[in-house]
């Protein structure tokens, strides 16, 4: 399968997987126009859409795409039923698309019904995990997001993390504000800064590398614990995650 990213709006990415026959899977099409342009340019035949959550910048293009290609099956969580979903899926279930099984993983936090899709090596994680960061807590709690990130972090090392937004540079600036002397974070920040200066995409990222540079996945890391302890004593990694998320919200 081939992985493609389609830029949308200011910083969204719509991911498309296609096979050798030209059949394709579209993930979180917030805008139909760039997707339709890519379909025409590549002569793709859309087979399915995956929705991770109900926010408009992830579902806004569904109606137009389905009108154009009525054979499309739209998979999504319960919260997307009124956004065009035709096949509701939940945690532990699978979606069989393009000859591959995609596992559905419940990841509440950004929204209560947020889900991710995984078929090795591809992880479509919507607004749960970003490179260097994680989604804001619009509906869920810090505890829920912490558990959700733990689920994703436990996936295989070679997982390709396909995030839905180009937030990497700002996330790495935040990471540097927390751990300014961390070698991995500094190296990755320089790499990301160079890519963005050329207007190049920073995604997807390899999960093994992401665990090293994403402070939200390092809540049991002694360097991070020492930084937090300078301000407040927090015993549980879940509490340290909440501290980080609160800091990021104000960054």
UniProtKB/Swiss-Prot annotation:
GO terms for molecular function: hydroxyacylglutathione hydrolase activity; metal ion binding. CDD domains: hydroxyacylglutathione_hydrolase_MBL-fold. It comes from the Bacteria. GO terms for biological process: methylglyoxal catabolic process to D-lactate via S-lactoyl-glutathione. Pathway: Secondary metabolite metabolism; methylglyoxal degradation; (R)-lactate from methylglyoxal: step 2/2. The keyword Zinc applies. Keywords: Hydrolase, Metal-binding, Zinc. Pfam families: HAGH_C (PF16123), Lactamase_B (PF00753). The keyword ATP-binding does not apply. Its cofactor is Zn(2+). It is an enzyme of class 3 (hydrolase). Its EC number is 3.1.2.6. Binds 2 Zn(2+) ions per subunit. Signal peptide: none annotated. Zn(2+) 1 binds at residues 53, 55, 110, 127. Zn(2+) 2 binds at residues 57-58, 127, 165. It catalyses: an S-(2-hydroxyacyl)glutathione + H2O = a 2-hydroxy carboxylate + glutathione + H(+). Thiolesterase that catalyzes the hydrolysis of S-D-lactoyl-glutathione to form glutathione and D-lactic acid. Belongs to the metallo-beta-lactamase superfamily. Glyoxalase II family. Monomer. PANTHER family: HYDROXYACYLGLUTATHIONE HYDROLASE, HYDROXYACYLGLUTATHIONE HYDROLASE GLOB. This is Hydroxyacylglutathione hydrolase. It comes from Escherichia coli (strain 55989 / EAEC). The gene is gloB.
